[in-house]
Amino acid sequence: MTEKNEEVVEDKNISDQTDENLTEEIESEADDLQVEPDPKQAEIDKLTEQVNNLEEKLLRSQAEIQNIQQRNARELQNVRKYDGQKLASAVLPAVDNLERALQVEANDEVSKQIKTGVEMTLKTLNQALTDNGITSTGEIGESFDPTKHQAIQSVESDEVESDQIAQVLQKGYILQDRVIRPAMVAVAK
């Protein structure tokens, strides 16, 4: 080999040895820099994780409490809204009986006075029902609605159009938006 080539090879060997020495030195210094984990830092990390978990549980609990409060408010509102349903259901048969009593012909003076008393009583009861959000449903000529009316029969009728109420057998009643009792009706064909 030529002298120049030998120098290049020798320089390369020196360079490789220098690189290896530097690499070993850097690795040695890196090992020295790697310190055992601080036990206090590990405890801090553990406590931080516990705090985060507890905060998450707190948020969930607060959301659950809020949902319960909203549900209770809705239920209370429904109780107030439909408060008179049980009483209305108990009173409606009396209203029906008073209406039937008014259909009887009054011939003498005493019967007429009794009929007037029954009319006043019925008017007072109907006003009390209306004041408490209870309305009647099922009038002749009204369109048949299966959510509010119960069709007992279908009849031929010249007075009303098809699918309208031709005859009311028993009035229905609605409290707010809830049907207490559907009207029993005959529907025109």
Curated annotation (Swiss-Prot):
Q: Where is this region: Disordered?
A: 1-38
Q: CDD domains from the xrefs?
A: GrpE (cd00446)
Q: Which UniProt keywords apply?
A: Chaperone, Cytoplasm, Stress response
- Show the ranges annotated as biased composition (Basic and acidic residues): 1-14
Location(s), subcellular: Cytoplasm
For the keyword Chaperone, the answer is yes
Q: Per the record, what is one GO cellular component?
A: cytoplasm
Q: Name one GO molecular function term.
A: protein-folding chaperone binding
Biological process terms from the Gene Ontology for this record are: protein folding
Instruction: Specify residue ranges for compositional bias: Acidic residues.
Output: 17-35
One of its Pfam families is GrpE
InterPro entries registered for this protein in UniProt = GrpE (IPR000740), GrpE_coiled_coil (IPR013805), GrpE_head (IPR009012)
Regarding protein family, the annotation reads: Belongs to the GrpE family.
Question: Quaternary form?
Answer: Homodimer.
Task: Please give the function described in this protein's UniProt entry.
Answer: Participates actively in the response to hyperosmotic and heat shock by preventing the aggregation of stress-denatured proteins, in association with DnaK and GrpE. It is the nucleotide exchange factor for DnaK and may function as a thermosensor. Unfolded proteins bind initially to DnaJ; upon interaction with the DnaJ-bound protein, DnaK hydrolyzes its bound ATP, resulting in the formation of a stable complex. GrpE releases ADP from DnaK; ATP binding to DnaK triggers the release of the substrate protein, thus completing the reaction cycle.
Name recorded for this polypeptide: Protein GrpE
Q: Which organism is it from?
A: Leuconostoc mesenteroides subsp. mesenteroides (strain ATCC 8293 / DSM 20343 / BCRC 11652 / CCM 1803 / JCM 6124 / NCDO 523 / NBRC 100496 / NCIMB 8023 / NCTC 12954 / NRRL B-1118 / 37Y)
The top of its lineage is:
Bacteria, Bacillati, Bacillota, Bacilli, Lactobacillales
